[in-house]
Amino acid sequence: MQKKHGITNMQKKHCITYIQSTFGNTIITLTDYNGNTKTWSSSGSVGFKGSRRSTNYAAQATAENAARVAIQLGFKFVEVRIKGLGYGKESSLRGLKLGGLIITKIRDVTPTPHNGCRPPKKRRV
């Protein structure tokens, strides 16, 4: 009997979702387990412009849009990797769940310096 090579049925329904949450926008990228990008969505592409892109509601709407497309592509389970310090971190998780995806794992991959470069000076307004 030959060994079966390729993707298992479980991996076909699984995807990795990267949420990049900045103070000005929220970008969500869906990839398969090999890292190939399947779809992406951002607050600007959903229809929010200017300062409305950085709101919690915009992040939730972006996540719901990405979840809708993921279900159309055949994904059901999602592993979430969150990066950034923006406002839409928790809202985007809520949006993925409202969109119909099942969240299996949540990882925070925000890069934190171990006392590396000096940060820029504070703004004086």
From Swiss-Prot:
Output the Gene Ontology terms for molecular function: structural constituent of ribosome
Q: Which key words are in the record?
A: Mitochondrion, Ribonucleoprotein, Ribosomal protein
**PROSITE patterns the UniProt entry points to:** RIBOSOMAL_S11
Q: Which GO terms describe its biological process?
A: translation
CC terms in the record's Gene Ontology section: mitochondrion; ribonucleoprotein complex; ribosome
Keyword Iron assigned to the entry: answer is: no
InterPro entries attached to this UniProt entry: Ribosomal_uS11, Ribosomal_uS11_CS, Ribosomal_uS11_sf
Tell whether Zinc-finger is among the UniProt keywords: no
List locations, semicolon-separated: Mitochondrion
Similarity-based family = Belongs to the universal ribosomal protein uS11 family.
* Protein name as it appears in the record: Small ribosomal subunit protein uS11m
What is the originating organism of this protein? Marchantia polymorpha
